[in-house]
Amino acid sequence: MNKLKKIIFVSLQSIMIAGIVCFAVCPISCKISETGIEVIGGDYVPPVLESVNVIDDKTVKVNFSESINLKGYVITEYIEDESDSYEHSTDEELSLALRTVTDFNNGIVCELSFENDNSVVVFRLHESTKIGKKYNIFAVVEDKTGNSLTCCVPFVGFNSKVAKMIMTEVRSVSDSKNGFREYVEFLVIEEGNVAGVQIQIGGEESKTYTFPAIDVKKGDVIVYHPEKVGEGIENEILDDLTLCHHTDSNENARDLWGNSEKSVIGNNDDIIVLYDQVNDFIMDAVMFRKADTVAWTKNKQLAADFINDAGIYDSSDIENANYTKGGTAPVSASAKHTLQRLNTSDILQKIHNDEKVELPVKVDSESWQIVKGGFSAGVVE
């Protein structure tokens, strides 16, 4: 009996000691095995990759959560199906980043420097990145205590000449019976590349569209179709503008498509923002509502707050929004009655006269209006 008590006491002691040790070594994962305590996690807390900032066509900054030592790196062009998202690895397996970083033969040559107590790595490439082209940074880093992180980080070539545009027409209501779908029409007022420019709808990230790398000229017309529904859909990325044969396409305009299978734009109430990410600049915005809508929803209020100081509207209060139903709207918004910018012809005249159009173009509650039967995707006049 005494022998049994002794065994139980010793066992309890062992369990308590094991538990204390496990707690003491957190955050290392551990378990109690037949042979004692066994470490099954990697290391303590590895560095965290916090952000990647493309500064210009030759400079990229990578920010970590703490001071790091860069053990190895490679910068390459985008690898299809392997570089679609951030990849971090803190285990003992050979990750994509670690596999790639062991081969320096195909990397883009660059020089390194460090900032902010070695928590920021600055890559200065010897060759310029191409506008809108995808690249990867593969790296292995360690902190001061040897905790390591391997990562595969995609970034996009810097857009050094962002094209300037304004919105000219919005169809907010679809008509599936006749094949009419919502769209936003744009007029290019200064040539350049549209890579990285965003169309933000209703303050919802899931509704945001980012333009691909396309060179455009002053006077070009672009039509963005959020709904990828119907026949004859083609993204006209290159010079041929006759590829698309959808009901809403026009061979004189460039048609670009989102990926949604359902409506994205609010029928009567919404805020659409044209945002230049590179220069942190709001090019254009339009707010619209039906007369009996007296407050924005939570997400739309975020969009309203975002454009409040842009100088487009006097303020982003809902009272300044353009009417789609009731109020001063001559007819209600529909697939055939679209919201149109009323001073488009004046802007076109400036373009034809080679006059500069300053952005943002100021508007008020009368600058946009529902036009009866006036829908004309891709036709700006």
Which residues make up each language-model segment?
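Solvent-exposed beta-edge/loop recognition patches
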Residues: 130-132, 220-381
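N-terminal secretory signal peptides that target proteins for export/translocation
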Residues: 1-9
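Acidic, low-complexity Ser/Thr/Gly/Pro-rich repeat segments typical of extracellular/periplasmic
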Residues: 59-65, 70-159
